[in-house]
Amino acid sequence: MKEDIQPKYGDMTATCSCGNVIKTRSTLAKDIHVDVCSECHPFYTGKQKVVDSGGRIDRFNKRFTRRSK
């Protein structure tokens, strides 16, 4: 078998925008930042909240309400 062909497998940290920190192991060499996690996602929490990134919903509604008039 060939030696040293496997990627390096080390510790990494995923930080959520809600402040939750998840420590795991991965071949990814750097820490990452995520928008939602299991602590703040509406499916897991049971609370309904709108995750609107940059007013996309408003732009969509504005664009298609003009056409329907």
UniProtKB/Swiss-Prot annotation:
Gene Ontology biological-process entries: translation
Cofactor: how bound: Binds 1 zinc ion per subunit.
Pfam families listed in its UniProt record: Ribosomal_L31
Cellular component GO terms, alphabetical: ribonucleoprotein complex; ribosome
Keywords assigned by UniProt, alphabetized: Metal-binding, Ribonucleoprotein, Ribosomal protein, RNA-binding, rRNA-binding, Zinc
An annotated Gene Ontology molecular function: rRNA binding
Essential cofactor(s): Zn(2+)
Function: Binds the 23S rRNA.
Family listed: Belongs to the bacterial ribosomal protein bL31 family. Type A subfamily.
Protein name stated in the entry: Large ribosomal subunit protein bL31
Protein species of origin: Teredinibacter turnerae (strain ATCC 39867 / T7901)
Gene: rpmE
